[in-house]
Amino acid sequence: MSAWAALLLLWGLSLSPVTEQATFFDPRPSLWAEAGSPLAPWADVTLTCQSPLPTQEFQLLKDGVGQEPVHLESPAHEHRFPLGPVTSTTRGLYRCSYKGNNDWISPSNLVEVTGAEPLPAPSISTSPVSWITPGLNTTLLCLSGLRGVTFLLRLEGEDQFLEVAEAPEATQATFPVHRAGNYSCSYRTHAAGTPSEPSATVTIEELDPPPAPTLTVDRESAKVLRPGSSASLTCVAPLSGVDFQLRRGAEEQLVPRASTSPDRVFFRLSALAAGDGSGYTCRYRLRSELAAWSRDSAPAELVLSDGTLPAPELSAEPAILSPTPGALVQLRCRAPRAGVRFALVRKDAGGRQVQRVLSPAGPEAQFELRGVSAVDSGNYSCVYVDTSPPFAGSKPSATLELRVDGPLPRPQLRALWTGALTPGRDAVLRCEAEVPDVSFLLLRAGEEEPLAVAWSTHGPADLVLTSVGPQHAGTYSCRYRTGGPRSLLSELSDPVELRVAGS
């Protein structure tokens, strides 16, 4: 897929408390089916492909295989593909695409044409989050491939449909949610019609107060700072359109802020004093009279040291500084006395970064590196800082060079389906590694160019092949690449076979 065909995120920088809105442009087309008669939805079917940009070329994909493209005399935003009565030759899973800037754009949503009843299940999703709290308008979006239907919302445990919404000119309906529970939706083409298959179930929780945001120290600030330095902290909420607050202990920090997205804010701390390193949290509040502040984030810590105290001693266990991959390494930082905070610092191609901060009861901190790999290689040192005035800090310890040779741990790849995949469906493969902050790559056997890429800070990532057809059958593996200046590439995972039904 070309860069032009990728999703475009166009953000504007704001120095206000939070950016009011962001512009999101998705170049993918939309596809829907229209029935000639609601009483007989499969008797005369037309598929309509609508593009957000004008184009002269449309293409229908059936069961993962592209059909003959349609060339128009003049640019248009939509094209209609008449199927007529649904038969064995027209039954299938459809998507559409269009050509923009000489490249075919990523395919549309899936429309299932079965020719049978009950009608295919719709999809259901939550907006903006899957929980409710005072002051928040949570909704459920029910989406069908068939236009002009009546949508039905069901709450688990209720005998009747909870709500009914007609959508004569649309393929979706939005339902407000006021109760926690398990929801699904279906649709029908006329009042006496049989409801479609139900959608998957989504769970709505009631959370009061709202869940905590995340607070992180920006990379340039995640080092040992001198008093008088500046630092940046980023607070990210699980939804947009909220007011943020930075606190240290119970006291609000009225500092400059900026935002590039309505779900986050950057706090800028200037002229930091020696004792300004610990205890930062953030929270958010919906813009409603009923809204309460969220739970506090986990605390973020800065390390400020004036270098006036004696250097600590840093030692390793085992003493061998070329451990085997997968081993446990313990780095011990010892100060002349107790009552201090310790920071472990690593220097690599990306510079000096604080790895961890500990506040033990005694004069020694023990930093554990579990399952070490090549990404843990670097020059380690440590410092300590007084936790009481005047908050003096130490010189850095002597450096220990830790070198872990050998390949990175291999990732694991598994398919999120069983058996042969139905043509036209998406193939979702989950790649998982023990290393954080990596890009996962999906590769087909014998090919070097990745077919899908996904970034993950922690945990697995789902790699998706859209609208698979017989041409996608084969063997797949994944690998990952670490971020930063010292980029490392893992070995391939064990292979997973993708079988496509009928091929």
Swiss-Prot record:
InterPro entries: A1B_glyco/leuk_Ig-like_rcpt (IPR016332), Ig-like_dom (IPR007110), Ig-like_dom_sf (IPR036179), Ig-like_fold (IPR013783), Ig-like_Receptors_ImmuneReg (IPR050412), Ig_sub (IPR003599), Ig_sub2 (IPR003598), Immunoglobulin_dom (IPR013151). One of its GO terms (cellular component) is extracellular region. The keyword Repeat applies. Pfam families: ig. SUPFAM superfamilies: Immunoglobulin. Glycans are attached at residues 137, 182, 379. It is found in: Secreted. Residues 1-21 form the signal peptide. The keyword Protein biosynthesis does not apply. Plasma. Disulfide bonds join 49-96, 142-185, 235-282, 333-382, 431-478. GO terms for biological process: cell surface receptor signaling pathway; immune response-regulating signaling pathway. Keywords: Disulfide bond, Glycoprotein, Immunoglobulin domain, Repeat, Secreted, Signal. Interacts with CRISP3. PANTHER family: MHC CLASS I NK CELL RECEPTOR, OSTEOCLAST-ASSOCIATED IMMUNOGLOBULIN-LIKE RECEPTOR. This is Alpha-1B-glycoprotein. The gene is A1BG.
